[in-house]
Swiss-Prot record:
PROSITE patterns: RECR, TOPRIM. Keywords: DNA damage, DNA recombination, DNA repair, Metal-binding, Zinc, Zinc-finger. GO terms for biological process: DNA recombination; DNA repair. The keyword DNA damage applies. Residues 79-174 form the Toprim domain. Belongs to the RecR family. This is Recombination protein RecR. The keyword Zinc applies.
Length: 198
């Protein structure tokens, strides 16, 4: 077996999402066997990210300022908001270069099994953004799984009385998958062919 401190490193690396025991071991060995790897720089960068990155006060995306680069960009279409579950979904949609509006990050999806209800998400903040009357369309871009569909249905129902056009991504995205893993072409076509709910 390994010395205790190496076991600790493998265990801590294994806590990261997508890093299983073998990947954690591989990363730990890489760090130990490559003295040229700047571990201090990695540590400083991790500390900086933790201290400097916050949630945008407008949309909930990651930001270094109170407002993220998308919300503060005057070239964005301020009449359309794309509602996503997580900041990683913003990245996936931005890669398509098919959407020029704003975003709203919910911070998850409705999941009664996991004890996550509408009040646990940034839905109230979304409704506050919609209340001023400048938004003409909401694009629901939640994951095509049960939780994402339940979340999209709930939001569409809540918004229905506001006279705002509500659309959702077109089919073509595999059911049960995450937006993050969809390729740019598929996601771009889903945006182009979005279907209006009301």
């Amino acid at each position: 077996m390994y010395v205790r401190i190496v076991q600790d490193l493998i265990r801590e690396l294994g806590k990261l999402p997508g890093i299983g025991p073998k990947s954690a071991q591989r990363i730990a060995f890489f760090i130990l066997q490559n003295p040229s790897f700047d571990i201090d720089r990695l540590s400083e960068t991790l500390q900086s990210v933790r201290k400097q990155v916050q949630f945008c006060k407008v949309c909930g995306n990651f930001s270094e300022e109170d407002e993220c680069v998308i919300c503060s960009d005057p070239r964005r279409d301020r009449g359309v908001i794309c509602v996503v579950e997580e900041p990683k979904d913003v990245v996936a949609i931005e890669k398509t270069r098919e959407f020029s509006g704003l975003y709203h990050v919910l911070g998850g999806a409705i999941s009664p099994i996991d004890g996550v209800g509408p009040d646990d998400l940034n839905i109230r903040q979304l409704l506050q953004r919609l209340a001023d009357g400048t938004i003409t369309e909401v694009v629901l871009a939640t994951d095509p799984n049960m939780e994402g569909e339940a979340t999209a249905s709930y939001i569409a129902r809540v918004i229905s009385a506001m006279r705002i056009r509500v659309s959702k991504l077109a089919s073509g995205l595999p059911v049960g998958s995450d937006l993050e893993y969809a390729d740019e072409i598929t996601l771009g076509r889903a945006l182009e062919g979005r279907q209006y709910i009301n």
